[in-house]
Every structure is written in C-alpha cells, then in structure tokens.
Amino acid sequence: ADNGRGNVLYLLGSIHTDRNNLYPFHKQLRDVILNAEQVSFELDFNDTDQLLEFAAMQTYPAGDSLANHISPALYQAVVQAAAQLGMDEGTVSQYKPWALANSFSSLATLDETSSENAMAIDLYVNAKAINAGIGIGAVETYAFQGQIFDTLSPEYQEQYLAGGLLLILDPDSISQETRDALTQVLGEDAFQPATQEAIQAQLDQISAMMDSWKARDA
C-alpha cells in the first residue's frame, strides 16, 4: 500500500507456520525486508521487559493463590492434573486460572516433536531484520494481550480453566471427583458424547495444522 507520499507498506500475512520450500525467500521479498525502515510484528519478540511483565501478570502476588479464586473441587482437579504433568501444588497455586487454561490448551496440541521444527515465518523475518540492523516494531504489546485475559470475569476464568482441563484429561479414566468438579463448572453436557466428539474434532483439526508445520509441506 502506498499513501501517495512515497511511503510504502508491505503486508506479509501468515498463521505463524511455514512450508518446506519457502526458504530462502524470493529475492524480491528479501529486498523488501532489507530495505525497510522498520519491520513490525504482532508482538516484539525481542522485548524482554515486556516478556517479564507478561509473565508477572500470570501469577498472584504474595499472600494470594489460585485456591482463593476457584471452587475447592476444581482446585483439587487442577492440582491432580498438574501433578501428572510434573507440576507441584506450590507452583500451580501461584498461577491465575487464565494462565493455566492457556497452558493446558497448548499442551493438548503439542507433542515431543513440536520443539524440533524450523522457525516459523515471523521469527525468520525477525531474525533477518535484526541481523540487518533494521528497527523492530509491534502492533500490540504483551501487556495488552495479557490484560485481555486478566480482566476476564472470575466466572469466565473458572470456565476457561475447566475447559482447558477437559482438553487434556481422558474422560474415561478421570476420577469421579474430577468429573463432578468439571460438571459443576461446565454443566452436564461437558461429558456428553456430542461434546466429546466436538472436542476431539477440534483437537484433530489443530493436530493436522501442527503436523503440517512440523512436516513443513502443507
């Protein structure tokens, strides 16, 4: 896009994934990056202060804990599920419901090979811009995105957390206490076949996208 005053904006869209034959970029695209005054992303991956601020937003201040913000039954369900993932209660209790829900949702779509993949498009462009000494900008901040989650109502955060648990737990092997805790928050439909089928379909769709990213031949 050209604003008529000689300022040209190039928009490179992606869903943070790539494909095997994408690199190296076409020379025309490389030239656009290397001749830019600034390269802007959704977030600035290089801003460590923002990353630390976002991390701090996910935990409670001293004297407060997760147990004070969700039902006792759901709290026990979270502690038990987290223990299976190698997290002790002391660690889990520091995190807010939305932060744990995000983590559980991510875990539901990852496997042991997910971290072995080549960088995605945005990280590639970011590295190229930094190496060329080009300024990095961002449309949003980590604090802005964190604030969206942090201002969710307590009721919504509890539902979000219960929903995250539902993604990572096997409904056929969980304890009755955990089932009751999730049902109390999510309702009787949570364990109905139609709901479980919808959850599995969602996970399958995300898994297919992740497989394409890992295989890099989408």
Report the location of each language-model feature:
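Structured, acidic catalytic/metal-binding patches in enzyme active sites
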Residues: D2-D217
